[in-house]
C-alpha cells in the first residue's frame, strides 16, 4: 500500500512558510526558522526521525517475535542531524536509541536483534546514504 504525504510552501525561503500532511492524521506547519533556527513548528528532519523510530520499532518487534521472544514494548528515539556540507544542508547522522521490555531475553541477544532491525527496516534502507547511523540498544 503506498504511503502518501504532501507539502505546500508559500513565499521566499527565509520568510516563507509551509504546511505538510502525512496520511489522514498528521499535519503541521514548517518554516526556515523551524528548520534552521530552532523556531516554532516542525521540520522535515523531525518527520524523518519519527518515521525512522516507528519503522525500526516495528522491525525490532517483528524480528524478536519471529525468534520466539515477543516484546512487551519497544521505545525508540531517533535524532537526525542536519549540517552544511559543501554549503548545502545535508543529513550527516542519525542516532537511534531503543529500550525494550522483552521477557526471557538477555542483553546481547537484544542488541543483536536491534542491529538486525537497524539494517533491515525499510526506512533505514531508504536512508542508507546517510554517512553515520548509530544505535544504542538496551533492555529496561
Description of each model-found segment:
Residues 1-50, 54-140:
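Extended beta-strand/beta-hairpin segments
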